[in-house]
Amino acid sequence: MATKRTFQPSVLKRKRTHGFRARMATKNGRKVINARRAKGRARLSK
């Protein structure tokens, strides 16, 4: 029995969990965005 691949890509799932709107929805998510802004990241979220 082969083990299944853990990465099953879905754009919708990715956006809902790691997207910009999802980050902004929570206090800790906003902390993530601000930390990435302070670091000078080109991409703040997926």
Swiss-Prot record:
Pfam families in the cross-refs: Ribosomal_L34
Listed GO CC annotations: ribonucleoprotein complex; ribosome
Gene Ontology terms describing biological process: translation
Keyword RNA-binding set for record: no
Family, per entry: Belongs to the bacterial ribosomal protein bL34 family.
HAMAP family named in the record: Ribosomal_bL34
Name used for this protein in its record: Large ribosomal subunit protein bL34
Upper taxonomic lineage: Bacteria, Pseudomonadati, Pseudomonadota, Gammaproteobacteria, Vibrionales
Gene this protein is translated from: rpmH
